[in-house]
Amino acid sequence: MLQVTIPGYEWFDEKTNSFGSTKETTLQLEHSLVSIHRWEQKWCKPFLGKEPKTAEECADYIRCMTLTQHVDPAVYNGITAEVMDKINNYIEAPMTATWFSDKDKQGSPHREVITSEVIYYWMISLNIPWECRKWHLNTLLTLIRVCNAKNAPKKKQSRREMMEQRTAMNKARRARLNSKG
């Protein structure tokens, strides 16, 4: 969870010909499947798609991430560039110590459009507990990737890979035993 403080500010509303203001507000934000699902319900397009988001869509996603209750909607207009950088860094953070080697990548990049419903499907098919939908999205996606890797059938080594592995093992044994073969 990320906690950010949005400074208070004043503005002039030309429609009502009056001034308005907000107080400094602290927001608790969570980048999760629940947040993405809320956003996709409103905008009817994939959040994780390659299409860039408008400023309005980005601001609305921050609203969807907000856990703090009873927030004045005008507060979101006071988000500074510094706060936005914090939010973007939080969204992009891996939030896990798990890493995958390049060998684990399968050929061409994934072309499927990933929506919240697709991620819910993955959770159901992999028997991932429902509570995980509130995790940071990158942590949840890493768990899904780990489950897929662990459930995948063992890949057979090619003849060449087996020969290279045996050659390396024999070379190591010869070095350890000071033998020539």
Identify the function of each model-found stretch.
Residues E56-Q69:
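Short, hydrophobic/proline-enriched secondary-structure or compact coil segments at domain edges
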Residues L143-G181:
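Alpha-helical oligomerization segments
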